[in-house]
Amino acid sequence: MIDTNWAIHGREFVNCNCSYGCPCQFNGLPTHGHCRAVAGMEIEQGHHGATKLDGLKFVAIFRWPGAIHEGKGEAAVVVDERATEVQRGALLRIICGQDTKPGATIFNVFASTLEKLHDPIFAPIDFQVDVAGRQARLVVPGVTEGRGEPILNPVTGAPHRVRIDMPDGFEYTLAEIGRGWTKTGGPIKFELADTYAQFAEIHLCQNGIVR
């Protein structure tokens, strides 16, 4: 039984090591057989019980040796340094998949695939995202630095717009697809260049996507 109700409504930017289409979005295997990803999110409105989460940001860095569903992954979470102690605890419970119906959110699903969760990092997060424009910037000094851009037509150079519609998903219902570059430091190190990126509006609660 879930004792605490929560909800977050905001925008995300995700960059992983797959090619532009990311087979994982279609229950395929990752492009290179393993997964590396960084996700940033800003909560426009949110709460965990009576604790307000409006305006806070967080970042999650992931690494799996194979496909996500095969497990053995590790993660590092960065929480907005502006959050109070109570807000930090609330965000970590949500991000770590607690207080959630099993399998209902990406946080809960991903948590079930991890064998190592590094100590949380509390730091300033520079995060800007334009979902419709497929533009993003995500910087946590010493931890991660990345950006997102539209895919370009190889012949004309014009922006190429593609979306993924996932009505029964556990993260988003509609995502704009682009490309991204990321370099991470800290406990999980890797570099991505011109790989899959998604930009989406997120509205989740303890029971999954809010529709």
Question: For each of these PLM feature ranges, what is it?
Answer:
Residues I151-R211:
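Extended, charged low-complexity segments
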Residues G28, G49-T51, Q87, G148, ...:
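Short acidic, gly/pro-rich beta-turn/loop elements at beta-sheet edges
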